[in-house]
């Protein structure tokens, strides 16, 4: 018993140390003040709740797993990643044979509805988990979420650090998104939601339905309670609250990159609702400040978290002060007193106990027996894809055979990636590639990738001449375009001579000494930095380099000079950086790539 208790405590301590991470690339804590964004990472459509002195946040995860990542804070500025609510999809609660609750001839969708197996074999880009709401009610944490192709589901737990229950599907409907529950002062439960025009054929309207007290089912059909076509176009992202005799719906409108934050209020859940814009960009550099949730602290202050769309960096998280005036919230700073605030970029910290200065996990030394919380796959992961070797301090990625319909890495389910952590950072990985010598058709490859709807990867590829290093680019990968090898070089077992030469696609690749299998260890690096534009939203680009010894670095160059890749966002998400190991021919065993460490620095 004593040994078991000690082991449990060591495990818990390991998880806590893993979760509390001091970032080497971004720090919003300025002492007595903070700087936005508080999280320079793609936690899209954030929502927040408070339980005692603790704050919890979740966000959209779309087709990435583990999904519905959970963050925790005690001061609203420093956030730690503590877990994820969704490890599988669509979950045991989904019933393919169940008739649709809401479906009409006017409803449409983009392509066929992905089935349960599709979520494990092919990335369903942009589908899945949209705009969740997190709430604490009667001793349990609830997350309600919309899937535009399926409907609305709920997951719950009594321990946000632990396992969440399987999803419960409240309504099977096309186009239902952005749900939020409310348990009101009269003992009734409600659910508001929006509608995705791409699936439902209608947008800019909000709905409400009565809900069971346990949040497991709707007690009646949804009905429209607000139409924003004239004044609040593309209104969505509902967050439902009750305060001082009013029901409030916080909703973004105007579009992702250029919209504003709207609030509706009424004396009845069914309306009629008054409307007011409570935050807009104004003369601030924060474009489209909207979609999030508000929270009252234990000390009586009000704060609002929301996102800002920064293109390839994703939708980063901001924290705004909030006050009340004449029964309406005012978010940000309202210098002209018109009741519509503008976002702050630097502001005093909330009146809360100081916590450590940390950010969600980034670097990984792979010293635990489970994959770090910062990593996600673009599909439900298979146990065949990787081995977290705590004893060896490595992450082993096995070469996964890709489908016969594979076109490029956009179709690869076994990419293991994480969000960009800052506007400017460097990622370096030490990897060792061991191809399977039994594969007669040499097709195994692995590498470091910067991934959006276009991508670039510094790749190790097995060939009959040995392992070769390739710089590969794929523009508009989401359209099925082919990869292009921009740089290729055989890797000699001895140190590279100086100066070295590059080989381009314009000519044949000359014979060079291959790297023997037993010595295939390479350091791969990508450096990401912003590219200033005339507007407020920066573009980004990256350069690549490699080393055989971790000391002398060789920059990947093009005929024009340093090779620079123009980074693109993914489908509703920012770009990601990560690793993979693939093959394209069948064999009863695979090769692998061992990742010794993956480090992010400024």
Name the predicted role of every residue range.
Residues 20-602:
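Carbohydrate-active catalytic/glycan-binding domains of CAZyme proteins
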Residues 1-5:
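Positively charged n-region of N-terminal signal peptides that target proteins for export
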Residues 10-19:
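Hydrophobic h-region of N-terminal signal peptides that target proteins for export
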């Amino acid at each position: 018993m004593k040994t078991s208790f000690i082991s449990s405590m060591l495990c818990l301590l390991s998880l806590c140390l893993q979760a509390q991470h001091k970032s080497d690339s971004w720090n919003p804590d300025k002492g007595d003040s903070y700087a936005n964004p508080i999280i320079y990472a793609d936690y899209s459509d954030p929502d927040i709740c408070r339980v005692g002195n603790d704050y919890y946040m979740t966000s959209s995860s779309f087709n990435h797993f583990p999904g519905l990542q959970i963050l925790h804070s005690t001061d609203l500025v420093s956030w730690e990643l503590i877990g994820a609510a969704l490890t599988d999809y669509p979950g045991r609660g989904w019933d393919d044979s169940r008739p649709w609750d809401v479906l009409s001839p006017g409803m449409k969708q983009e392509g066929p509805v992905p089935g349960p197996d599709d979520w494990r074999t092919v990335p369903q880009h942009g589908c899945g988990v949209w705009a969740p709401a997190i709430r604490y009610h009667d001793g349990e944490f609830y997350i309600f979420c919309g899937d535009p192709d399926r409907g609305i589901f709920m997951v719950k737990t009594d321990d946000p650090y632990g396992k969440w229950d399987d999803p419960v599907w409240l309504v099977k409907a096309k186009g239902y998104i952005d749900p939020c529950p409310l348990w009101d002062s009269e003992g009734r439960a409600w659910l508001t939601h929006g509608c995705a025009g791409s699936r439902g054929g209608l947008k800019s309207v909000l709905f409400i339905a009565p809900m069971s007290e346990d949040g497991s089912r709707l007690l009646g059909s949804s009905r429209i309670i607000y139409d924003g076509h004239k004044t609040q176009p593309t209104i969505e992202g509902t967050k439902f609250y009750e305060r001082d005799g009013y029901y409030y719906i916080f909703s973004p409108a105007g579009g992702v990159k250029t919209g504003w934050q709207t609030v509706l209020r009424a004396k009845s859940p069914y309306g009629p609702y008054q409307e007011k814009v409570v935050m807009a960009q104004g003369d601030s550099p924060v474009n489209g400040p909207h979609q999030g949730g508000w929270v009252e602290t234990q000390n009586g202050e009000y704060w609002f978290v929301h996102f800002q769309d920064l293109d390839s960096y994703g939708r980063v998280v901001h924290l705004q002060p909030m006050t009340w005036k004449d029964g309406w919230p005012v978010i940000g700073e309202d210098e002209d007193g018109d009741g519509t605030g503008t976002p702050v970029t630097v502001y005093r910290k909330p009146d809360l106990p100081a916590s450590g200065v940390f950010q969600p996990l980034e670097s990984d030394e792979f010293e635990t027996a489970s994959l770090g919380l910062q990593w996600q796959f673009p599909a439900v992961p298979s146990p065949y894809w990787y081995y977290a070797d705590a004893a060896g301090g490595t992450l082993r990625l096995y070469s996964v055979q890709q489908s016969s319909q594979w076109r490029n890495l956009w179709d690869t389910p076994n990419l293991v990636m994480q969000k960009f952590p800052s506007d400017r950072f460097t990622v370096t990985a030490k990897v060792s590639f061991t191809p399977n010598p039994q594969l007669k058709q040499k097709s195994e490859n692995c590498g470091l990738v910067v991934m959006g709807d276009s991508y670039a990867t510094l790749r190790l590829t097995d060939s009959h001449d040995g392992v070769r290093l390739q710089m590969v680019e794929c523009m508009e990968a989401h359209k099925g375009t082919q990869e292009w090898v921009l740089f290729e070089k055989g890797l000699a077992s001895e140190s590279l001579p100086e100066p070295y030469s590059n080989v381009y696609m314009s000519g044949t690749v000359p014979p060079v000494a291959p790297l023997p299998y037993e010595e295939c260890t390479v350091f791969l690096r990508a450096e990401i930095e912003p590219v200033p534009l005339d507007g407020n939203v920066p573009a980004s680009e990256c350069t690549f380099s490699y080393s055989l010894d971790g000391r002398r670095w060789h920059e990947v160059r093009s005929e024009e000079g340093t090779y620079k890749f123009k980074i693109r966002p993914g489908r509703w998400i920012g770009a990601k950086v990560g690793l993979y190991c693939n093959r394209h021919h069948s064999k009863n065993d695979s090769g692998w790539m061992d990742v010794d460490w993956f480090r992010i620095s400024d």
